[in-house]
Amino acid sequence: MAQAEVLLTKEPAPQSIDVCELPQKKYEVACNTGAYTSAGLATAGFRTAKYLMDEWFQNSYARYHQAFADRDYSERQRHESKQLAAETGELAYRTQLDSTRRVGERLEDMHCWKSELQREIDELSSETDQMMAQKLRLQRALDALSVPFSIATDNLQCRERRQHPDLVRDYVEVELLKETELIRNIQELLKRTMGQAVGQIRLNREHKENCEINWSDKVEVYNIDDTCARYTNESTQVQFYPHSSKFEESASTPETWGKFTQDVLLRAERERLASVNLRKLIDCILRDTAEDLRLQCDAVNLAFSNRCEELNDARQKLQYHLLKILSEITDQEHQIAALKQAIKDKEAPLRVAQTRLYQRSHRPNVELCRDNAQFRLMSEVEELNMSLKVLKEKLQDAEQALRNLEDSRMSLEKDIAVKTNSLFIDRQKCMTHRNRYPSVLQLAGYQ
């Protein structure tokens, strides 16, 4: 009855029969206990075991009244039960309809969040793939840097084999040192960027996994709620679960439930945007480093070209002077031969003059006269000795000049050999090796 009173929502309908007390009719019955009754003392014991008529009527009326009351109560209870059944049926219908609507709303919310999570998962997956591609570009760029670094170091080592006086710290060496330093700095930068890319990929995968876990939970819940929404009173799978109406202690509230998913999406979106920014930064780094390397490579090539022109010009000048020296050596050798011949030519007249003087010194007595012939012979000998002295001095000077010319020739030939060796190193060794320098696409990691 207590449950029925709780479920009633309006006053009971008016009864078909008004509830009232039965009329109490009094009947006058003659008593057999008077002084002049015909009953004797012999009937005194039988009267005590029988009801009086008044009691009989009272008993009948009591039965009527009880039957009427029970019937009336039964009718009221039947009416109230019918009304209660209708009301509870209506209430159960409305409650079930509202529950189904609420479950449907929950399904819509779940579908919305599930779609957002799916979108974020797809975007994170795409972003991670793009970041992996950027990481691959970084690795390719790092691998490509080994070629220019080996070229630059090989050029420096080859140029160490230049000979004196070409073993100088020229602008080619300065540019090569700049190139090696630039390559080292770029390698360090790309390695640090590679570490950042690897860390970002790991974060992307972690947040993608969080989104996938949340999405998987929501798919499971969506299927559960979808199944629940399809249950009807005619469903055969439903049964009683008395303890299912209790709230779990670990159950979340709608606010915490929504905030949890929103936080997961916000963190994933934040990491995805960070990944996008890092990917753009990597693209700029690879483009700028590739351009810087190619500019430095062009600067080194230009320095090599200018230096080779200088060396070739110096060698041509040395060869020109060598030809002049060789020509002068030939002329000087001819001159020395002429001087020697001139000296030789003076020996015969000197012998003649000295012999004449010697023979005339044997003139006897007064014939040993200092005549003009004697004076002339003496002056002739003196002139011839003076000529021989001058010619011998000139011969010595010519021979010294020839020795100087030979030294210059050897020095020029050595310098020409040094310049030829330097040209061979710079042009054949270094510049030919630099033709293997990677392209901009290779340095940018595209190939």
From Swiss-Prot:
A biological process from GO: flagellated sperm motility
Superkingdom of source: Eukaryota
Post-translational modification note: Ubiquitinated, leading to its degradation. Deubiquitinated by USP16, promoting its stability.
Pfam family, one: Tektin
Signal peptide (UniProt feature, chain positions): none
Keywords (A to Z) from UniProt: Cell projection, Cilium, Cilium biogenesis/degradation, Coiled coil, Cytoplasm, Cytoskeleton, Flagellum, Ubl conjugation
GO cellular component: axonemal A tubule inner sheath; axonemal microtubule; microtubule cytoskeleton; sperm flagellum; sperm midpiece; sperm principal piece
Coiled coil: 114-143, 324-348, 375-423
Keyword Cytoplasm: yes
TM spans (from-to): none
DNA damage among keywords: no
Location in the cell: Cytoplasm, Cytoskeleton, Cilium axoneme; Cytoplasm, Cytoskeleton, Flagellum axoneme
Function: Microtubule inner protein (MIP) part of the dynein-decorated doublet microtubules (DMTs) in cilia and flagellar axoneme. Forms filamentous polymers in the walls of ciliary and flagellar microtubules. Contributes to normal sperm motility.
Family stated for the protein in its record: Belongs to the tektin family.
Subunit organization: Microtubule inner protein component of sperm flagellar doublet microtubules.
Protein name: Tektin-4
Species name: Rattus norvegicus (Rat)
